[in-house]
């Protein structure tokens, strides 16, 4: 039974971890669109190559095929991201020096393990790299707590980190590997803290958190407030005159124009049928144009 659970968990951990490695593709697409790396840091890619290489050597030394498959794919993806980052980085000197340092560290580790294979020493180093990677989002948590909102936290990434960390923590318990349990347990704890912030804090400023909305729904505070506002007249809006629809307005204008035209024709007909009579009256003014004979 344990073997079946371990196989299912291995397949699930491989799938979710490889899917998490593909999160670098949107970053590379953004770099390509803007034509340069800009403010994007290449350190996560370098740390991915470094940590993946150490974990790959750890898996080879332990002959753990689940770790071997995951870290082969991980090192390949992170190496491709590093090459892509190097192409678009200006100037290239800084990132090239960092890449040489990482490559030298990996080479030294491979030579050291070849002459002195020690699983415990390598496990401690791998565990340290994992804890450093999981501790990187702590700066983002500081920003969230300072702003009292979670708009800067990516929810899909937090959920993915929780799934991957919890699966590897359970996998470490099944294979009884403390070097897998400790870093992934810390990562799972940090992921739970991040996910809890989505419940406690609002998504954006001037919004209510889901926890506050749920509390108001249970206590009926919002309903009581609305009823109180209705009683005091705060929610009553002043009545505004109804706006006549445009089609009705046009029909009224046409009807008024037709009535005005009909009234004008009726007045003209009355004038023609009954013209006004003018009474002639003698003028007392002498006719200055008549010639007396």
Swiss-Prot record:
Membrane topology: Multi-pass membrane protein
Bilayer-crossing regions: 8-28, 36-56, 67-87, 95-115, 124-144, 155-175, 180-200
InterPro entries reported in the protein's UniProt record: SWEET, SWEET_rpt
Principal place of residence: Golgi
Biased composition (Polar residues): 279-293
GO cellular component: Golgi apparatus; Golgi membrane; membrane; plasma membrane
GO MF term list: sugar transmembrane transporter activity
Protein name (Swiss-Prot/TrEMBL): Sugar transporter SWEET1
Organism: Caenorhabditis briggsae
């Amino acid at each position: 039974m344990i073997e079946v659970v371990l196989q299912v968990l291995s397949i699930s951990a491989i799938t979710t971890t490889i899917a998490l490695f593909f999160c670098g593709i949107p970053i590379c697409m953004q770099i390509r669109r803007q034509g340069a790396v800009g403010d994007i840091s290449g350190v996560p890619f370098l740390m991915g190559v470094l940590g993946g290489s150490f974990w790959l050597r750890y898996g080879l030394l332990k002959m753990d095929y689940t770790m071997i498959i995951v870290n082969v794919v991980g090192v390949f993806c992170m190496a491709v991201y590093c090459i892509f980052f190097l192409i678009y980085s200006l100037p290239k000197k800084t990132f090239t020096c960092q890449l040489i340092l990482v490559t030298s560290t990996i080479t030294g580790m491979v030579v050291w393990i070849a002459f002195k294979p020690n699983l415990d020493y390598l496990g401690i180093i791998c565990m340290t790299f994992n804890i450093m990677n999981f501790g990187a989002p702590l700066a983002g948590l500081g920003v969230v707590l300072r702003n009292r909102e979670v708009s800067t936290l990516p929810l899909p990434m937090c959920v993915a980190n929780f799934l991957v960390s919890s699966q590897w923590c359970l996998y470490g318990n099944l294979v009884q590997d403390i070097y897998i349990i400790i870093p992934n347990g810390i990562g799972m704890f940090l992921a739970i803290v991040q996910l809890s912030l989505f419940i406690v804090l609002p998504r954006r400023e001037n919004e209510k958190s889901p926890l506050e909305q749920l509390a108001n729904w249970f206590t009926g505070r919002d309903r009581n407030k609305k009823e109180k506002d209705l009683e005091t007249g705060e929610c009553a809006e002043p009545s505004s005159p109804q706006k006549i629809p445009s089609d009705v307005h046009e029909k009224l204008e046409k009807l008024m124009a037709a009535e005005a035209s009909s009234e004008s024709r009726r007045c003209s007909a009355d004038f023609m049928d009954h013209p006004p009579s003018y009474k002639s009256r003698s003028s007392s003014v002498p006719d200055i144009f008549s010639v007396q004979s």
